[in-house]
Amino acid sequence: MRNHLNLHLDRGFQVGPPSHIDSDTMATVKQVQVTFDCTNPRAVAEFWKAVLGYVDPPIPPGFDSWDAYEASLPVESRGSSWACQDPDGIGPRLYFQRVPEVKTVKNRLHLDVRVGAGLTGDERVSALEAEAARLGPLGARRLHLLPADEENEACLVMQDVEGNEFCLD
């Protein structure tokens, strides 16, 4: 069985039956940022920018480019992080931070790239495969197709340029 927790921009979270939440004590989430541990933050950010149509955040005040900003940092801090964001401000910001270790196990969290929403059967699989073909030259790796079952439509499991799993859904 595979179940995904999906954040849909038009419907909010979908997980099980609703429970009572006291709105007086509930925190109000203003934004969501997804953070990736990686060895090359800029390369992973460039990959996800191409996948999602995201852009770099605004250049910090006082600098004419991100490269100029990076050059102003201490040597040990250069290249330690990068980010990208939805140009429309709707999707979550993605943040990439350098860590010394490489990925060794399956992700506990992954992104679903919703390219087949509303499609079923062969039409859905064709859309997933077409997107996988587009992402291959960017450094993505196709792992396997999870066929449709009684609970879920088909999805395609992929890896980004550093081996982080994601699904074409």
Annotate each language-model stretch with its function.
Residues 1, 52-53, 136-140:
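Glycine-centered loop/turn motif at secondary-structure junctions
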Residues 1-25:
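N-terminal amphipathic/basic-hydrophobic helices that include classical n-h-c signal peptides
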Residues 16, 46, 50, 54-56, ...:
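Acidic (Asp/Glu-rich) sequence patches and key acidic residues
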Residues 20-22, 27-36, 58-59, 68-73, ...:
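Vicinal oxygen chelate
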Residues 27, 39-49:
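Hydrophobic ligand-binding cavity/cleft-lining segments
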Residues 43-44, 119-127:
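Short, conserved charged micro-motifs
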